[in-house]
């Protein structure tokens, strides 16, 4: 297909609270080099898609407070390709905003939608996979998501059950989706993996812009009606007023729950490249390849570790000696103004840090 009709939407609106205290409201994780690669998450994502989508067809959707950070980190981004959300309303409104914007430019648009915080370990294979998926949706009115063969019963990811029985892991062609399950508990995740029918849901989607518009109007009319007329407001003096009003009245809902779980157009493309959704400290620990013999992962200047296993130690400033003794499956996260010592289990951490919402901790958020 003609790549001039291929677009990419990078969703970069999250606040990254599960990566606190390194990720803060003023500069969340998508704008940080949490994985110590030399590039921020959003920079890596942008560069990854340059291999398959024309530069002028890459759009970024983020909170309006992050305008300057995005333009600083992605200076090649055309200003009109930065879509600013006045409020966070989850992925369905974000996708509606981008879809209506793209359709005004190009009614023939084919779109890949991606989060901004993924780790991919084979950029060439990734580009080939996206290109193949674009080719597949060209001849089919389907909504495609990329599925990843699970390597562990991870409770931080959603799961997709593919049609095709217990041999689906051998398949390298798109498959119709049977069920979606959002973040099961560990026991259920183990059952899923044992069946050989389930994949991790990568959260990367591909579709024709016109097809997702029609499907969202069918299943999420309360969202899409907020953006009707956007094509007339775009580029005019009422543009900001229109979007503020749309987001004020818009329902907070994900595209998975609002559309993908309901439509019979959901298909999954199994991928072979290495993938990680770095949404939590626990997920970062899981993808770090360099661990010591006791399973400790360290990103710090100097450490003294004894009688300790399965621990993640992170000190972004790398100015201190971090000494750890007698811990198991913990994380030690040290910044200039906050020190966190906590079990690295994501659910426990999320409950624990809810306390930073108290007024006396405002400056640390």
Where in this protein do the model-derived segments appear?
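Left-handed beta-helix
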Residues: 2-5, 210-365
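A residue-level structural signature of the nucleotidyltransferase/glycosyltransferase Rossmann-like core
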Residues: 111, 204-205, 276, 331
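Residue-level signal for inorganic ion chemistry
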Residues: 42, 98, 117, 160, ...
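General beta-strand structural signal in soluble alpha/beta enzymes
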Residues: 60, 83-84, 113, 146, ...
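Short beta-strand segments
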Residues: 10-12, 61, 112-115, 145-149, ...
């Amino acid at each position: 297909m003609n790549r001039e009709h291929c677009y990419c939407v990078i969703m970069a609106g999250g606040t990254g609270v599960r990566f606190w205290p390194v990720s803060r409201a003023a500069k969340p994780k998508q704008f940080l080099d949490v994985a110590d690669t030399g590039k921020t998450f959003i920079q890596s994502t942008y560069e990854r898609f340059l291999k398959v989508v024309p530069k002028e067809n890459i759009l970024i959707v983020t909170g309006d407070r992050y305008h300057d950070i995005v333009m600083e980190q992605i200076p090649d981004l055309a200003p009109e390709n930065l879509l600013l959300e006045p409020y966070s309303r989850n992925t369905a409104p974000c996708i509606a905003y981008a879809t209506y914007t793209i359709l005004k430019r190009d009614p023939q648009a084919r779109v890949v939608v991606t989060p901004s915080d993924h780790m991919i370990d084979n950029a060439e294979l990734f580009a080939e996979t996206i290109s193949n998926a674009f080719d597949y949706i060209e001849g089919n009115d389907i909504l495609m998501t990329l599925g990843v063969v699970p390597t562990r019963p991870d409770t931080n990811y959603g799961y997709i059950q593919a049609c095709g029985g217990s041999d689906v892991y051998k398949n390298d062609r798109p498959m119709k989706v049977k069920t979606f399950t959002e973040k099961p508990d560990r026991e259920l995740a183990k059952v899923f993996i044992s069946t050989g029918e389930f994949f991790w849901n990568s959260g990367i989607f591909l579709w024709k812009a016109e097809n997702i518009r029609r499907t969202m109007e069918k299943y999420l009319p309360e969202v899409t009606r907020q953006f009707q007329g956007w094509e007339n407001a775009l580029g005019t003096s009422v543009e900001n007023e229109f979007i503020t009003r749309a987001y004020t009245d818009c329902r907070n809902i994900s595209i998975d729950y609002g559309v993908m779980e309901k439509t019979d157009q959901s298909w999954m493309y199994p991928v072979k490249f290495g993938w990680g959704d770095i949404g939590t400290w626990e997920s970062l620990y899981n993808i770090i390849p360099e661990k010591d013999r006791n399973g400790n992962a360290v990103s710090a200047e100097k450490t003294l570790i004894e009688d300790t296993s399965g621990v993640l130690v992170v000190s972004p400033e790398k100015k201190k000696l971090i000494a750890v003794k007698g811990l198991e499956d913990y994380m030690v996260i040290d910044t200039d103004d906050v020190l966190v010592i906590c079990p690295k289990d994501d659910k426990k951490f999320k409950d624990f840090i809810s306390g930073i919402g108290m007024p006396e901790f405002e400056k640390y958020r």
